Amino acid sequence: SRVKILSSLKIDETRVPQDGRFRTFAFGRDIDFRVSTFPTPVGEKVAIRVLDPTVGLKGVENLGLVGHAAQMIEEAIKKPFGMILVTGPTGSGKTTTLYALLQELNNVETNVLSLEDPVEYFVEGLNQSQVRPEIGYDFVSGLRQIVRQDPDVIMVGEIRDGETAKLAVQAALTGHIVLSTLHTNNSIGVVPRLIDMGVEPFLLPSSLNLMLSQRLVR
């Protein structure tokens, strides 16, 4: 119950999963904790993810990318518009890579906006927004509104459906840098996946700047 109170969850609701987060000051810094509850026949199971900015937030130079891969990323983020898509299995560090790219692009002259589910790390200078599908605020509705905020860089936590994919491509074609993740087995799988989602094939060459597939070596 204490964890649910800290996370602003309903303590009397044990029948459905709930998600929340709380922040505490420890070791001289603020540390966020993401909480997920899951109902079982013998009680609720709780998973807590520690989000320590000093550990989770990395620069591009700390991602372990070297040689041609590092050069391709450096060239891609210098382009004035286009999409950079990161693929890989769950837990492979896709979000870490996105945050590294965002920090590289983040400066006082650049309007950076993000749509996340949820916001993992709060970064100074970024305009971060958490989608809430339960009230109709999802990636699709968020993307429609975000382009009216005069963004230079748009980060979408994940492209999950065809409508989000089409809006992201349109944003990339209209002068924005778009960063996102996609679930495919490899980087070459991005193209057929987007086409399968309903994106017109002729739009991809002019909208895709970089497709990056990664794995986490443990």
Residue ranges, per PLM feature:
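Short, flexible helix-loop junctions that flank or precede catalytic/ligand sites
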Residues: S1-R218
